[in-house]
């Protein structure tokens, strides 16, 4: 019942904004889809997904599937929380943000890779955490495959593979299972890199990681402190750090030193030079780098959404009263303008049709109903408190979703720049971690019961009703024909965490 209004909101978004919303990156994904090539700027797994759906010639099919993925994420969060012992109301509460956040609904409506990425990551997490006794070999392999596919969508799958691998080692999962996850994860990644090598002459996922890291350090890089070699001096700037623009300006705008490089900066040679320069800046100014990352990450926890990185980008995260124009610029003029292949994908007009009154409803809803960043931060703190209580088990099962949530926010700030759309996929993991950390049977759950003055009670053992009839029937069920008291005859039932602590083989 809780999900029904969330479904209706997504139906309203489809009817009000027919049949998609646009972000600048959307058109590069479509360019790569129509011409079926791997983008040197970013991983093109989402373009491959769009290519699979292209025979429908419909953006409605794309966005409806993404709305369904968003709903599926909520279902998985609820199901996993309940399966690991959370009360129904608490599991429901964990799923509410992804169901009802207005910005989440708008993100699902964008032709962007974030929702498929979120779906794959939540599915992998659910698979790994589902069995209290630990994941099987097949489960680890499938989770690894999902992470590999996620890395082909956005270059965050491999860092998160490290998170999964460390978690499984902490939970004493066998090395064979950890190896299976890693090897299977690398299969789609290596295949993608091989095709990229054929197209661009570089065994990599893109020719942009160095460029983006360069943009990160250019907010503070001081060349006199860095011992810059001659071939990298052209990457320096004389503008004082206090007067420099935001990080992304050093990628996309003409004043950027990278703009001097011909051919374009998204090629193997300039990307490598930019990466060398960035690493040099981090090594020479580690505290400045840490401050830049911390300042950007802190934006995720503000109560209000301030306009960032600029008004044009901020507006693309809103349901607007009018259809936004398709940009006239293009990152590869030889292939044609963005409007041409946005139209080619559906063989029709690619402009969003804004239809009242449906558009009015979801537009007003988005402005007022969303999870403030401060609340997201508090949820993270709740999860962290549960991890601290479970310090003897290094955080327990909640460690995995909590670490994923934090990584999804910190990694973009550390490698490029903060963006609001990177926060939304982090929220379900934070909610899941907080609920799992304080579920009955965990250290957090036992702490809550002690705080309330109640003894520990496993969630799978029913509470005594206190009535004579109930007590009698309960006693007869437990004693059976043998007459053995229930305390002696009932097997010890512990939580998944307790069972694992007693197991001789945690694999």
Regions found by a protein language model. Name each.
Residues 1-21, 100, 185-195:
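Transmembrane signal-anchor helices characteristic of membrane glycosylation enzymes that use polyprenol
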Residues 140-154, 165, 185-192:
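Membrane-interface alpha helices of multi-pass inner-membrane proteins
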Residues 24, 62-71, 96-128, 137-138, ...:
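Multi-pass, polyprenyl lipid-linked donor-dependent membrane glycosyltransferases
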Residues 77-100, 115-119, 132, 137-140, ...:
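Transmembrane-helix signature of polytopic, membrane-embedded enzymes
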Residues 160-186:
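Perimembrane helix-loop-helix junctions
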Residues 50-57, 62-76, 117-120, 372-383, ...:
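Transmembrane alpha-helices of multi-pass, membrane-embedded glycan-processing enzymes
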Residues 206-348:
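Membrane-proximal stem/loop segments at transmembrane-domain junctions that anchor or position
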Residues 12-29, 37-60, 205-206:
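Extracytoplasmic catalytic/substrate-binding loops of multi-pass membrane glycan-assembly enzymes
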């Amino acid at each position: 019942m809780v999900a029904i209004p969330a479904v209706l909101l997504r139906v309203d978004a489809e009817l009000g904004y027919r049949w998609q919303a646009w972000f600048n990156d959307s058109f590069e994904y479509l360019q790569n889809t129509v011409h079926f090539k791997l983008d040197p700027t970013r991983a093109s797994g989402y373009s491959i997904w769009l290519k699979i759906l292209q025979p429908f010639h419909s953006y409605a099919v794309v966005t409806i599937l993404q709305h369904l993925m968003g709903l599926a994420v909520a279902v998985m969060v609820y199901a996993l929380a309940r399966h690991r012992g959370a009360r129904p109301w608490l599991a429901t509460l964990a799923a509410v943000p992804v169901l009802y956040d207005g910005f989440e609904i708008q993100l699902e409506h964008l032709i962007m890779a974030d929702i498929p990425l979120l779906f794959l990551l939540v599915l992998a997490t659910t698979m790994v955490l589902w069995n209290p006794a630990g994941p099987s070999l097949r489960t680890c392999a499938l989770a690894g495959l999902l992470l590999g596919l996620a890395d082909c969508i956005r270059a965050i799958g491999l860092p998160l593979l490290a998170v999964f691998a460390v978690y499984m080692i902490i939970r004493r999962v066998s090395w064979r299972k950890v190896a299976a996850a890693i090897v299977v994860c690398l299969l789609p990644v290596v295949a993608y890199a091989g095709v990229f090598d054929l197209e661009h002459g570089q065994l990599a996922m893109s020719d942009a990681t160095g460029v983006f890291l360069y943009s990160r350090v250019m907010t503070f890089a001081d060349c006199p402190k860095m011992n810059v070699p001659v071939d990298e001096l052209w990457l320096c700037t004389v503008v004082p750090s206090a007067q420099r623009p935001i990080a992304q300006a050093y990628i996309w705008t003409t004043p950027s030193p990278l703009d001097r490089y011909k051919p374009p900066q998204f090629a193997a040679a300039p990307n490598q030079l930019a990466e060398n320069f960035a690493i040099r800046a981090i090594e020479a100014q580690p505290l400045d780098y840490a401050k830049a990352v911390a300042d950007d990450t802190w934006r995720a926890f503000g109560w209000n959404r301030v306009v960032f990185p600029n008004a044009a980008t901020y507006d693309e995260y809103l349901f607007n009263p009018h259809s936004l124009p398709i940009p006239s610029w293009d990152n590869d003029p030889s292939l044609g303008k963005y409007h041409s292949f946005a139209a080619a994908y559906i063989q029709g007009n690619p402009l969003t049709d804004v239809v009242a009154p449906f558009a009015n409803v979801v537009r007003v809803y988005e402005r007022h109903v969303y999870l403030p960043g401060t609340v997201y931060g508090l949820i993270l703190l709740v999860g962290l408190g549960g991890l601290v209580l479970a310090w003897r088990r290094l955080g327990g099962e909640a460690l995995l979703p909590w670490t994923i949530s934090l990584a999804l926010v910190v990694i973009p700030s550390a490698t490029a720049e903060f963006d609001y759309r990177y926060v939304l996929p982090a929220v379900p993991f934070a909610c899941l971690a907080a609920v799992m950390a304080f579920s009955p049977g965990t250290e957090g759950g036992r702490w809550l019961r002690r705080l309330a003055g109640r003894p520990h009670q496993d969630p799978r053992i029913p509470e005594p009703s206190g009535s004579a009839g109930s007590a009698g029937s309960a006693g007869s069920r437990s004693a059976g024909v043998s007459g053995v008291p229930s305390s002696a005859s009932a097997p010890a039932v512990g939580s998944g965490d307790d069972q694992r602590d007693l197991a001789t083989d945690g694999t």
